A protein has these predicted regions:
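ATP/nucleoside-binding phosphotransfer catalytic cores, i.e., glycine-rich phosphate-binding loops
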Residues: 281, 285-348
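Bacterial Sec-dependent N-terminal signal peptides
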Residues: 1-31
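Short Gly/Thr/Asp-enriched flexible loops that form oxyanion-binding sites at enzyme active sites
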Residues: 127-145
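Conserved anion/nucleotide-ligand pocket segment
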Residues: 169-234
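ATP/NTP phosphate-donor binding region
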Residues: 29-118
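Internal helical hairpin/lid segments
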Residues: 240-296
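Short, acidic/small-residue loops that bind anionic groups at enzyme active sites
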Residues: 140-163, 169-175
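A short helix->loop->beta-strand "cap" motif at the edges of active sites that frequently abuts
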Residues: 118, 144-149, 168, 274-275, ...
Length: 348
């Protein structure tokens, strides 16, 4: 055994010496390689804008549409009024507890819409919960051959993240059941969505706020629902915010929940090299924030990012309120924040 070890050692040394004397670099077999996230380049791939006669698929990758037939009919009417054709996901009205069918059924509807080159946009019917359960079932191979717009917000943030990390733009906007009390789509929401999908430049002027932290920033707009951004941390669907402007909205949370999620984003580096933050609607907060936290929500957020000097815009009309304007995620924007007036301009 001793002599065998001597022979093995001699062979190893001989191989090392040969490798050192070779004019070619030795072949190294990597073990346990850790691939770091790669920052997305400045310009993401933009799916083709819609034109009259194009087809849009309406699917529900998350919550069920129980008693929502009238709302979907209104969604179809809206798209038809833009001279667009509509197809519905085969399983869109299925129910599996709170979901629109099983994970397999919801994934199948979304996959068919991704794969069909004749479908030019996918409009998600609603959020709720369930999108994260189908993320790893989706195959974007055909999507990359024939990119299309994916539209939605709230729980659809998970898919926006996934598409962003593939290098494509998507649209954060109203969904198929986003109707007002009159069972109609508010014009202030429908008009910018139409502009976004047909290629008209989006530019918003927002009333100022004394809580705003003034400044000017340029960068890709990324983000969405805070809970979903927090849920994605540590996964391949988390996003790189370096050099970008982060949009956040939330609904139905207590102050300490919001603080905890923001602190988690901070610890994950979301604010380290961020260019700016746009805060959308923080809606239907549970409890009395002044009684529970002692400060308004704006100050809670400013406290989390106090060591950074980027601009912070509050009260942008996007999120879980009736006024929910379209945002093109992945598009470069110019953000100008003031206490009297602020602007968000998308660069076409």
């Amino acid at each position: 055994m001793f002599f065998k070890r001597i022979i093995y050692f001699a062979l190893i040394m001989a191989l090392v010496n040969v490798g050192c004397k070779s004019t070619k670099s030795p072949i190294v077999v990597p073990v346990n390689i850790i691939v770091e996230p790669v920052a997305i380049s400045e310009n993401l791939i933009r799916p083709p804008y819609l034109k009259q006669g194009d087809t849009v698929a309406i699917v529900s990758p998350a919550g069920n549409l129980n008693n929502k037939v009238a709302e979907i009919e209104q969604a179809i009417k809206l798209l038809n009024s833009w001279n667009l054709n509509v197809v519905l996901g085969e399983n869109i009205f299925n129910q599996n507890n709170e979901f629109a069918g099983t994970d397999e059924e919801r994934a199948a509807d979304f996959q068919k819409a991704l794969d069909n080159p004749n479908i030019k946009a996918i409009w998600c019917a609603r959020g709720g919960y369930g999108t994260v359960r189908i993320l790893d079932k989706l195959d974007y191979t055909k999507f990359t051959e024939h990119p299309k717009w994916v539209i939605g917000y709230s729980d659809i943030t998970a898919i926006h993240n996934q598409i962003h990390n593939l290098g494509y733009e998507s649209i954060h906007a109203i969904m198929g059941i986003s109707l007002d009390i009159y069972c109609e789509f508010p014009m202030e929401n429908a008009a910018p969505l139409k502009d976004a999908v047909f290629g008209k430049q989006l530019a918003y002027t927002i009333e100022g706020s004394v809580e705003n932290r003034p400044g000017i920033a340029n960068g890709q707009l990324v983000g969405g629902n805070l809970t979903l951004l927090h849920t994605m941390l540590g996964s391949k669907t988390s996003i790189d915010t370096s050099g970008k402007i982060l949009f956040i909205e939330e609904v139905g949370e207590q102050a300490y929940h919001i603080d905890r999620m923001l602190q988690s984003l901070k610890r994950a580096g979301y604010f380290e090299n961020c260019k700016g933050i746009v805060i959308g609607s923080i809606s239907k907060m549970r409890g009395d924030i002044l009684e529970d936290w002692g400060k308004p929500i704006e100050q809670l957020i400013l406290d989390v990012v106090k060591e950074y000097d980027f601009p912070v815009l509050f009260n942008f009309p996007a999120g879980h309120e009736e006024d929910n304007r379209a945002l093109i995620l992945g598009r470069t924007v110019e953000l100008t924040v003031g206490n009297n007036e602020s602007t968000l301009v998308f660069k076409n």
